[in-house]
């Protein structure tokens, strides 16, 4: 199999806002901007899906069983294809350094969204023990206006991170239950463990995109003879599973990845360096918007909808945050009711029960002076929690240009650049609200637009109860077509991937 961290940022996307929008009717312009914003949330999740399906769903049972005999150093190149159209390439190099290994992984990728081709580049360096356990790494992503760099080192039972985003470096420390792997370290370890049909392995994997460690599994399905070029080769078919997602790959006995297939039609094919980097072979791309929408019965005037009842099918829904607050979930049916605005309280929130939702994170830098100063300027001394939350919502809506950006959003970067989609709106709002003393969490799910449901993100604020709002749409509170599936940061939001391509929604009633 072949592992590439770069896929987790496959879809960093920028669309320049044209002055022709001013010639549109106000409602038509807003409809187009909203559709761009909800599309971009889905693209981030697509990047997570492909990264998980290809590159994190490989696994290891017995770390102690790995020996370095048979490890092959050198380079491996692949072309990346979308429905038979070449969209990029990936390159991995394994190097022996004394009693350890250095693994380099780089990828470049194009994606067509709404007629615009966007380019993403990632580079990962991983330094491991002789058994391919992670010692330290650095990860860089660059695309358009967005860039991020993460460095990490295993220190005892902690993974210590330096995260550079928005011009600021923050330190984070993550407790480890066991020594972790990066995705690109897995194949050498898997080869050493043995490719025997019927075997199943587990790997604890650290994902720089979500900054957490989770397990994945891989099973060796069959041993086959296939034709590769002008000759036959023995290959092993592997089924990779992560959180319900599956991908299939074929690798040779000595570890060459011949082919990989993901659930969304992305394919990696083994190529020479010259072939992999032949960018002139890229033909017309498939516009990703064709994969976004969840068809549904029509909802007239969704922004004014205060009650919605819908049937959700096609995928197991255990473990999602579908029940609670403004949602009632029974069987396969969810009801959403927009709450009346409560009286709220005086800022800052003084309870200790929601401290975690007032704290900064690596990407929600609510303790940074620039965030605090901006919140103070917006609120102008207003201490009423409801009014403050509403003012922040209106300011973020007005301040952030609706120029879609697929990235790993950072509040400081959004504050500086003032462009983005629903992820950027939600991240900046969350940072501003927390800095003002309003407990705030991020939600992800689906929202209805003119022709169906799209994946989307929005904040929820604590005003005596959790109130869903939407700074992307300037809704306070958010309309009832916002169906929440998860709450939490990016690591939790990526559970949405279980729904992609499977979820079906039937609107039963709305008003």
What does each of the following model-derived ranges do?
Residues 27-156, 163-167, 172-175, 186-350, ...:
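Acidic, serine/threonine-rich low-complexity disordered tracts
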Residues 16, 20-26:
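Short, positively charged and aromatic/hydrophobic N-terminal segments
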Residues 5-8, 14:
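Short hydrophobic targeting helices and cationic amphipathic motifs
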Residues 84, 389-397, 429, 433:
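Conserved hydrophobic/aromatic pocket- or pore-lining residues that grip, position, or stack substrates
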Residues 183, 342, 348-420, 489-494, ...:
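Secondary-structure boundary elements
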Residues 189, 200, 409-414, 449:
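Acidic/histidine-enriched alpha-helical segments
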Residues 55-61, 229-237, 243-245, 249-250, ...:
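Hydrophobic/aromatic-rich core segments of domains that either
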Residues 2-4, 18:
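Position-driven detector of the extreme protein N-terminus
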